[in-house]
Amino acid sequence: MARKGSIEMKAKEGAFYAKILLFGEYSIMCDSMALTIPYSHFQGELSFIHEDKYTDQEFAEESSQSLRDFYNYLHNINERGEMFFEFDLNRLKLDIELGMYFESSIPQGFGIGSSGALVAAVYEKYAVNRILPDSSIPSEKLQQLKKIFSKMESFFHGVSSGMDPLNCYIRNPLLIKPDSSIKPVGIPREFSKSGGIFLINTGKPGKTGPLVNLFFEKCKEDEFFNRVKNEMIPFTNQSIEAILKDDFKEFFSKLRSLSGFLLSNLKPMIPEAYHSIWQHGLDTGTYYLKLCGSGGGGFLLGFTEDIKAARQMLKSRDVEIITVS
């Protein structure tokens, strides 16, 4: 259960928030811990084109076509006997024919779970005997949901861990351990009276597939893989452990090391225009940046002990921030 004063989300049934992977991008593929949170600034829900919604007609029609393609994927894996969960595919097909689409403010390709929210919404509405979301849900149920969501979201990414839809569906911070166990956790809303988490919009979407492939190719090099194992993973795990213990002196120490590692070793994942901005945070200690998802564009994730100072410093470099917590 999330403790008092921690990040947790409550939303009406049918509405699904974006998610932010605070820690674990790339390193989770090499068995690090990971920590993910819901982000209520963006959300989406299934709707119908004829309803009075803010989405323009063109977007709604494109979204409806995407849902049609998603239905075909689900239908095909069901026909092949690969769907190990029961769906009301007939009702899904009928609703798509009636003009259903995904009404969403979650930007696509920005690393905050646009497809995850859609998958969670479809599961909630059309799964038969679905597992109900709850912050105290047993670990075995979380694993079962993760497996289901992995199969569903693979339509969008080719391969999916299922973590994005799981976070969108549970609406609670989740800790993923190296043994793949998952549990809801409580994390503080604020690092201090003046600190916080923020996003930077790089202005263009990223492409997950090519960057993930690049990381795997780099991991075939012994020198790079050893750095991942001996530096990136410990910095990630130690950052997570510190934030969960409210030890913010330790947290910012390990976060600085992780941020420096990312800039030195994963530069292709960081838009070139932000290399100097990233380094400036490391040099001054006013803020520290890291990837938000696979990178290459989308959002960057920032942490600071003084949100006002970070905002002013970044604004002087023509960078606006979006506060997360």
Regions found by a protein language model. Give the residues of each.
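C-terminal nucleotide
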Residues: 3-23, 27-29, 36-37, 44-96, ...
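Glycine-rich beta-strand-to-loop/alpha-helix junction loops that act as flexible
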Residues: 113-115, 292-297
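Gly/Ser-rich catalytic serine loop of serine hydrolases
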Residues: 105-117
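Stable alpha-helical structural segments in soluble proteins, enriched in small hydrophobic residues
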Residues: 117-129
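Detector for intrinsically disordered, low-structure N-terminal pre-sequences
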Residues: 1-4, 121
